Amino acid sequence: MAKKLFIETHGCQMNEYDSSRMADLLGEHQALEVTENAAEADVILLNTCSIREKAQEKVFSKLGMWRDLKQQNPDLVIGVGGCVASQEGAAIRERAPYVDVVFGPQTLHRLPEMIDAARSTRKPQVDVSFPEIEKFDRLPEPRVDGPTAFVSVMEGCSKYCSFCVVPYTRGEEVSRPFDDVIAEVIHLAENGVREVTLLGQNVNGFRGQTHDGRLADFAELLRVVAAVDGIERIRYTTSHPLEFSDALIQAHAEVPELVKFIHLPVQSGSDRVLAAMKRNHTVLEYKSRIRKLKAAVPDICISSDFIVGFPGETEKDFEQTMKLVEEVGFDFSFSFIYSARPGTPAADLADDLPEEVKKRRLQILQGRIHQQGYEISRRMVGSTQRILVTDFSKKDPGMLQGRTENNRIVNFRCDNPRLIGQFAQVHIDDALPHSLRGTLIEGTLH
């Protein structure tokens, strides 16, 4: 009977990508088959996130739940990867001594030998080093599962924002070779992928070396990816305002495969707070980039990240954030109350803002952005939208779903699985709080 692999993933899309590559790697080297049931697994991997304190505590809570499985099956291998593993290293075993393997985001390619060593020696294996881009040279070609796929183009971040652990857990920025990225996209397209999402902690900071030794920037990469036969849509995340260049904006104007949606984190609308965060840009500079982007693509939708209650944030600072929210018209956000991360400069700042004030501000911010997003969705009612059909609806197996150019989920009545992977025109009938409902226009599939 085939041995089983269970992977649980916390955090960002980069972690989702890494988890898929772990499955590819262990499927090829150890013939492990992915299962959705941890209780039947021979190997359990937890791919972790350390961006917030609650996310980190969630790791040890989950490991505690798996301790009984280890007691029942001493041959079970439990591994912890991702950013908590990178940050904590061998210290993870002080709280969870039954963990066999600890690996970082840059060492996941060493999983087969680490698992083998843990089994043969009965000793824990820990490797959270930063061997730069080596992991991409050691990973098998990605498996295709549906019409969409993630492609990692660079790793790490060199911005060192005062609140962020990423440079310490994923290392400095390292771009994959340009030709390697294109080769992966071609492989995906040849196997039925029609939409790719290019990933990086600072994806628009990509500087990939070409076969002739030249460095190509992210705007050039987008244009070449768009030229790959079969690729009809391109998304990317996450961007940094500092490197949202005029060349990138021009690509949005000229490359039809780029969707009309961008995620561009700003964190705060206060220059004073941005300086304390070491974001190295002002609100005015951010607004200038948004103005140019909207001039290039008038109907583009923009989402962002916000941290509420950063140490020293005043009511005036928060009001400036709300002003920016309304001026830009963000329609979605990842927004959280500030959580001090050990080892970051911001962790040394006095955090004396009452918790109830932070919660109130977060509620106001999220409420306003949700309202703006819903208003955009309502304006889409009556329109016809081109969507890529990706799967059955999660709530109704009699419906299919896909995404619009501006990142709205659309559900429509149809139970024919052969539509999955095709583009279709859908008439939008109704706007719900988190999705749209529509009717398939017959004869529009392609």
UniProtKB/Swiss-Prot annotation:
Cystine residue pairs: none
Ion transport keyword on record: no
PROSITE patterns associated with the record: MTTASE_N, MTTASE_RADICAL, RADICAL_SAM, TRAM
Requisite cofactors: [4Fe-4S] cluster
GO molecular function terms noted in the UniProt entry: 4 iron, 4 sulfur cluster binding; metal ion binding; N6-isopentenyladenosine methylthiotransferase activity
The entry's keywords: 4Fe-4S, Cytoplasm, Iron, Iron-sulfur, Metal-binding, S-adenosyl-L-methionine, Transferase, tRNA processing
Boundaries of every Radical SAM core domain copy: 143-375
Residues noted as binding [4Fe-4S] cluster 2 in the record, renumbered to the chain: C157, C161, C164
InterPro entries: Elp3/MiaA/NifB-like_rSAM, Methylthiotransferase, Methylthiotransferase_CS, Methylthiotransferase_N, Methylthiotransferase_N_sf, MiaB_methiolase, rSAM, rSAM_horseshoe
SMART domains with a match to the protein in the record: Elp3 (SM00729)
Cellular compartments annotated: Cytoplasm
Record note on cofactor: Binds 2 [4Fe-4S] clusters. One cluster is coordinated with 3 cysteines and an exchangeable S-adenosyl-L-methionine.
First-listed, main subcellular location of the protein, grouped into a coarse class: cytoplasm
E.C. designation(s): 2.8.4.3
CDD domains: Radical_SAM
GO CC, one annotated term: cytosol
Catalytic activity: N(6)-dimethylallyladenosine(37) in tRNA + (sulfur carrier)-SH + AH2 + 2 S-adenosyl-L-methionine = 2-methylsulfanyl-N(6)-dimethylallyladenosine(37) in tRNA + (sulfur carrier)-H + 5'-deoxyadenosine + L-methionine + A + S-adenosyl-L-homocysteine + 2 H(+)
All copies of domain TRAM, residue ranges: 378-442
Record-listed [4Fe-4S] cluster 1 binding positions: C12, C49, C83
Chain ranges of the MTTase N-terminal domain: 3-120
Function statement: Catalyzes the methylthiolation of N6-(dimethylallyl)adenosine (i(6)A), leading to the formation of 2-methylthio-N6-(dimethylallyl)adenosine (ms(2)i(6)A) at position 37 in tRNAs that read codons beginning with uridine.
Quaternary assembly: Monomer.
This protein's name: tRNA-2-methylthio-N(6)-dimethylallyladenosine synthase
Species assigned in the record: Pseudomonas paraeruginosa (strain DSM 24068 / PA7) (Pseudomonas aeruginosa (strain PA7))
Gene: miaB
